[in-house]
């Protein structure tokens, strides 16, 4: 089965990588005679990446580009790629070539065999700082528990059949999590391993702050489980109150003086902290609902090439 392959490459401030990435992918696709298009999605970058994408589009007839009016985030860039892709199937990959393009050939062959989702699974996480690795492992352990999907070595490097692309695009939620949703939808799926390569140039745009924000957003957008923390905390506070109440009654019956300015203050501080945490969790979900009902687009395209 032959079919057009759309290679979607979200990009943000990675102008130095565009030429090499385009050349490498074009050479591999040409060598293996795979009908393809490359779709760069510029996520409102501040460097000269859009000029480089336009130049690559003029140099290579199969290279296209989409330019956002501002930065909307990687998830929105992936959604835009799925929207503008013309292929019978698509591959989503990073611009820095840490997702080895040669693996696309293997993924395409598996699609030809009838698989509708081909997931590239990390054999290792490559070179990362200790805190980055710890946070990533913690996040994926949590999301795996919440979704009952093994996300420990998952990546955005995936091939999707056109029908899977359409299913994802029909999900109208504003805050989507592509890595989890593309597994959650099901379909005939297989996996291939890959080793994370070193970046060709530049540095990762993910800071500790952005990773934490990304983790919280995706956990709350994909699962309501954190809301159960509020209920659990309520039961814990009730249990503590009952224990202290019984203790106070016993002391009163025994004629023991009830002590306790320090105890009262500590209990108030503890209960207030729990209440504030619970309100924060509820508030985050309310903010998510607010984002959904505003009905704003997930991205705005200012230019195409």
Roles of regions detected by a PLM:
Residues 6, 35-37, 62-64, 116:
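Structural signature of beta-strand start/N-cap positions in the alpha/beta core
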Residues 42-51, 97-98:
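A conserved acidic beta->alpha catalytic loop
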Residues 14-17, 45, 100:
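Donor nucleotide-sugar binding loop of glycosyltransferases
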Residues 1-27, 33-34:
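N-proximal low-complexity "stem/linker" segments adjacent to membrane-targeting elements
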Residues 22, 34-45, 66-67:
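Short beta-strand/loop segment that forms part of the nucleotide-sugar
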Residues 55, 64-70, 74-84, 89, ...:
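Acceptor/aglycone-binding surface of glycosyltransferases and processive sugar-polymer synthases
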Residues 1, 177-305:
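Hydrophobic helical membrane-anchoring modules
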